[in-house]
Every structure is written in C-alpha cells, then in structure tokens.
C-alpha cells in the first residue's frame, strides 16, 4: 500500500496521494494528477490500475534503450492512428517511446519535404510525451521542461556514441 504524499501512476496519470479515506469500510486513495490541479480522483487502494512511479535508475535504463526501440510500421497510411491508439491503451514506456519516435520522424520527413505536419501525428506525439515525461520528471525530481531536455540530450548523445 502507498502512503500520503507518495507519487503513483494511475492509468496514464502521474498523481500524488493527498489522503487515504474510508468509505463504507473500503479504503480509497484521494489522488491529484500532477498536471491538473482541478481534478481529484478517488480510487480503491486495491485498484489494479495503480502502480509505483519508476526509479531514477529505471529511467536511465529506458533512455539507454531508446535507440533500440523500433518505430511503428504500417502498410496503409490510414492505419497509423489505430496503431497509436492501440499502443496508448497499454501505455508502457516502450509503447510511448514508439509513438514519440514514429510521430516525430514522420513529421520531420514532412518538414524536409516542405509539407504540412500531420495534426494526427502531432496530437499523439504530444500526448505520449506528456505521459512519459510526467513520470520521468517525478522519478528524476526535475520539472517537465528540464526532464524533456535531459531525455533529448541523452538520446542525442547515445546516437553520437554509436
């Protein structure tokens, strides 16, 4: 069981536990998502969608392996959104990185070709980034923007070292 002021991940939200309450002989966490002060979530303490925030060492290991995570390949361009949605349903760190890498590279290619970026790719890129970097920022004890810069710099360094 987690305690008051602990950070946890509930579904795709990084939250802190404001308090633990009891309603009809059942304990509940009162959660506040770190990116939405106006939202309060009450969930039973035994909810299967709650997990701990990863550690700093786990973040480092994930960053080290980003280079090895494949992008999404689709035969039919119209299927990309379905792939993004499928990966978000099971938003593992690897799945989020697949979305980020794929959408980033697809839009970078469009920019090089002087084409308009895809709103669909951009939307999923931002959503996957938000989910991933919110958790990383708690694990690294950094703000969101510094976390994003740290990850990008680390990945770029990894590609240069290859």
Model-derived segments and spans:
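Charge/polar-rich, low-complexity and marginally structured segments
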Residues: 55-162
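A positional/architectural concept
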Residues: 1-51
């Amino acid at each position: 069981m987690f305690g008051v002021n602990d950070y946890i991940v509930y579904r795709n939200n990084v939250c802190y536990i404001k308090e633990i309450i009891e309603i009809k002989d059942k304990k509940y966490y009162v959660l506040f998502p770190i990116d939405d002060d106006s939202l309060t979530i009450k969930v039973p303490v035994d909810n299967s969608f709650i997990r701990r925030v990863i550690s700093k060492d786990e973040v480092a290991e994930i960053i080290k392996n980003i280079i090895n995570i494949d992008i999404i390949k689709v035969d039919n361009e119209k299927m990309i959104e379905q792939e993004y949605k499928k990966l978000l349903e099971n938003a593992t760190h690897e799945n989020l990185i697949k979305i980020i890498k794929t959408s980033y590279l697809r839009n970078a290619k469009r920019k090089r070709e002087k084409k308009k970026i895809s709103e669909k790719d951009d939307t999923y890129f931002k959503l996957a980034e938000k989910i991933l970097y919110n958790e990383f920022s708690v694990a690294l004890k950094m703000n969101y923007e510094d976390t994003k810069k740290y990850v990008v710099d680390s990945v770029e360094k990894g590609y240069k070292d290859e």
